[in-house]
Regions:
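Cysteine-rich, disulfide-bonded extracellular modules and peptides in secreted proteins
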Residues: 33-94
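A generic signature of intrinsically disordered, low-complexity regions enriched in glycine/proline
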Residues: 28-30, 36-43, 66, 104, ...
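Short, solvent-exposed coil/turn linker segments
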Residues: 5, 71-73, 506, 510
Length: 595
């Protein structure tokens, strides 16, 4: 075996070396030609009397009876069926709620101006949440950067002190210096003092520094860039995943293929010093003076310190490339300004934090946003990424036109399907997981209506993780951006113990108008509008008892598993992110290099 060595210095602590070629040993990709797993819903339910946490996280209960076994003291919370310190409980429960996060702007190309970057923070605990922000190990003053909002309004009020239980705030983390003027630049709202005025994200491929946000109790965190992005035309949002759920094995997922306005991107983040990251690239990594390049299918090694991120932005996608680290890391996939499709008339920044490989699933439900012009068959792109050779896919109710039925390790497949034409896709077993994303096309189509229809300029390219059914949870809190004309949430619920459980949305009560998905009767979906053309969304109930959904903080819960994805769009602008997710380990067999 030939050994190649490439070294480079990244700042003072970041280096890379290309090491020996991949082995032909594919042990981790053993084929399994057995039939697909039998549907669990066809088997009789067995009593499950394990201990678990109550929905409010305040008690340990019996799963089969709901009987309270232990009520947690006020200063503790339930996690992994044990009363413990709140942050430890959140880490044990492995969800998107947590106490330690890293994130950075998805401004991967400096051709686009440094606009306002904001974070939506929701206190999901029963105690006040204290928030701290740092970068490069230095604390950042946020005393003038935290604001409250009113449901359905863009008005902001300064917030001081801790976030109350169940409360939410917007933290304005970054903006350009005062006086900046540029086309499509969106500054932070008047009266806001952003926490920072500099950008520590590299221009295209390079090394940058991420923000670190920590709290004393669990919160839900979303990064929005730019805030008020409906006027920037390039907005994106991502649910930020806590450090406690990071992993040491990943597969790179870019947001979309390259075009003349934008290139596929990945940001790999370290939370500890002396983190060693090895990438097995599916295509050549084009290096520069800051980052060592590497030929396709030959591993390249990088060293990172806490809070650093390695950013790779290039025309050739690296989707399907394996990333392995000696300490927990995470990755954000995206595109510096994607056109979907590549002939679309406008582009948009894409960014999603990608779950580590061990959290990928073998079953997903595909269903999209409320159609932009009323056509439930509006073609919406889906993308699949496979992790194992010999991955076989089955669908219900039918195979969508163009959808793959077999995939190999590192392979990417895309197809379009009606936004309301819901389907279930599953592989032969849990050890053949896939990643699935949903996308929105440009609001003006391709400008001519030849390959992509126009939607009157509404919406723009977007990219969002679809949550695996094995990662559904039973409560979420999230924030709908009031600066967008349209905000809608898509909810999918799974049958639990032979029955569908009510799903409660704070502005609506128990949701109705569920539609079946597939043929086995295991899933249903519904949608709720939170705004329409800047006006309030759906109304529930009659007379004095009627309630109206609006933008701002949203809370949902159920006694059964479900998922919720928020979509927002405006003229040539869009954003989307999951309202939350469990982050359970679903896979036992490690990744192996893709040859």
């Amino acid at each position: 075996m030939t050994r190649r060595v490439i070294t480079a210095v990244l700042g003072v602590t970041f280096s890379a070396a290309c090491i020996g070629a991949c082995s032909e040993d594919r042990t981790g990709f053993a084929r399994n030609d057995s039939d697909f797993d039998v549907d669990a819903s066809a088997l009789p339910d067995a009593p499950d009397c394990r201990l678990q946490c109550s929905l409010d996280g305040r008690s340990v209960i019996e799963a089969c009876t709901g009987k309270v076994v232990q009520k947690c003291p006020d200063d503790l919370a339930c996690g992994a069926a044990t009363c413990q310190e709140p942050c430890a409980a959140a880490a044990a429960d492995r969800s998107s709620n947590g106490c330690d996060f890293y994130f950075q702007m998805p401004r991967m190309d400096k051709i686009y101006p440094h606009s306002c970057n904001a974070a939506f923070i929701i206190n999901t605990s029963t105690q006040p949440a204290e928030v701290t922000l740092e970068r490069k190990g230095k604390a950042i003053d946020i005393s003038k950067s935290v604001f409250r909002t009113t449901p359905g309004s863009t008005a902001l009020s300064p917030h001081e002190g801790a976030i109350p239980p169940g409360g939410s705030v917007i933290l304005f983390v970054s903006d350009s210096p005062p006086g900046t003027e540029a086309w499509d630049y969106i500054k932070c709202p008047d009266g806001v003092t952003p926490a920072t005025l500099d950008d520590t994200v590299a221009n295209r491929t390079g090394v940058g520094s991420s923000f670190r946000l920590t709290t004393n109790v669990p919160v839900s965190l979303t990064s929005m860039y730019p805030f008020g992005g409906a006027l920037s035309y390039v907005a994106s949002a991502t649910l930020v995943l806590p450090v406690a759920t990071w992993g040491t094995e990943h597969m790179i997922v870019n947001g979309w293929e390259g075009s003349w306005t934008g290139k596929p991107s990945v940001q790999i983040v370290a939370s500890e010093d002396d983190t060693e990251v090895t990438i097995w690239p599916t295509r050549d990594i084009l290096g520069n003076s800051a980052v060592a390049g590497a030929p396709a299918r030959e591993p390249v090694k990088y060293r990172m310190d806490r809070g650093q991120h390695l950013q790779i932005v290039q025309t050739e996608e690296l989707t399907g490339s394996i990333v392995v680290s000696n300490k927990p890391t995470t990755s954000f996939g995206g595109n510096s300004c994607a056109r979907i499709s590549v002939s679309a008339a406008a582009c948009d920044i894409l960014s999603q934090q990608i779950p580590p490989f061990e959290q990928w699933g073998s079953e997903y439900v595909g269903v999209g946003y409320r159609p932009r012009v009323g056509n439930e068959h509006e073609p919406m792109p889906y993308r699949f990424v496979a992790a194992r050779d010999g991955t076989r896919l089955e669908y219900e109710p039918a195979i969508p036109p163009g959808a793959p039925t077999t995939m190999n390790a590192g392979e990417v497949a895309s197809f379009r399907h009606g936004t309301g034409d819901a389907f279930v896709v599953r592989t032969q077993d849990a050890e053949h997981p896939i990643y699935v994303s949903a996308h929105m096309t440009g609001g003006n189509g391709d400008g001519f209506g030849i390959t992509d229809p126009s939607y009157g300029g509404m919406g723009d390219p977007e990219f969002v993780n679809i949550i695996a059914t094995g990662q559904y949870s039973n409560s979420y809190s999230f924030y709908a951006d009031p600066t967008y004309a349209e905000n809608s949430v898509t909810i999918v619920r799974r049958k639990s113990n032979g029955a569908f459980k009510d799903v409660w949305l704070e502005c609506a009560g128990n949701l109705t108008n569920w539609k079946p998905v597939g043929t086995r009767g295991e899933y249903e979906f519904t949608r709720v509008d939170l705004s329409r053309n800047f006006q309030p969304g759906d109304t529930f109930g009659d007379g004095d008892a009627a309630t109206v959904c609006r933008t701002g903080l949203q809370r949902m819960r159920s006694e059964g598993p479900f998922t919720a994805t928020l979509w927002g769009w405006d003229v040539n602008a869009s954003y989307a992110y999951p309202g939350g997710t469990a982050q359970r380990k679903l896979i036992d067999t490690p990744l192996a290099p893709v040859n």
